[in-house]
């Protein structure tokens, strides 16, 4: 509790953030060469920050959705980012679309486990090692319950 009310810029605040990052790396098996950032707000802010900063409008992008949060990421891609080379891949609520149809050169945004529907991808076999596209993964409902294939995930977001 000694850090409550203290700035994240203070020595104590920085130490607590470093501890949270180090513990996250250890608990989740995040590789040493992966960067970990802590953002204010929720996973919504984190995934939107990743989308806004990592998706290139000149590249093809696929956003896959099978539950409510994935549909929010589609709306962000369509209405906010206005990505011109956008492929939307959806399935009925609670069903998983055929992810093997996503071109490996495309950047891809997906939700690992549907928080609201419970539908989850079983693995990342549909992502080829060394694929060309950037992979942005909303792992909020999966990060502490599923094994993450870090080698295939460029940006993984979650909330505590």
Which role does the model predict for each range below?
Residues 2-49, 66-71, 75-76:
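Conserved N-terminal alpha-helix of the aminotransferase class I/II PLP-enzyme fold
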Residues 44-160:
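Conserved PLP-enzyme active-site core in the AAT-like
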């Amino acid at each position: 509790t000694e850090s409550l009310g203290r700035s994240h810029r203070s020595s104590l605040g920085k130490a607590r953030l470093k501890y949270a990052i180090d513990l996250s790396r250890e608990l989740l098996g995040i590789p040493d060469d992966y960067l970990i950032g802590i953002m204010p707000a929720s996973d919504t802010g984190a995934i939107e920050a990743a989308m806004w900063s990592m998706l290139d409008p000149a590249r093809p992008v696929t956003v896959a959705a099978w539950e409510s949060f994935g549909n929010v990421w589609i709306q962000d891609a369509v209405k906010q980012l206005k990505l011109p080379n956008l492929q939307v891949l959806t399935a009925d609520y609670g069903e998983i679309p055929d992810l093997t149809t996503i071109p490996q050169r495309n950047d891809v945004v997906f939700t690992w486990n549907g928080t609201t529907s419970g539908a989850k991808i079983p693995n990342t076999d549909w992502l080829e090692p060394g694929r060309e596209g950037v992979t942005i993964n909303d792992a909020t409902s999966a990060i502490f319950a599923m094994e993450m294939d870090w080698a295939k995930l460029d940006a993984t977001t979650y909330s505590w």
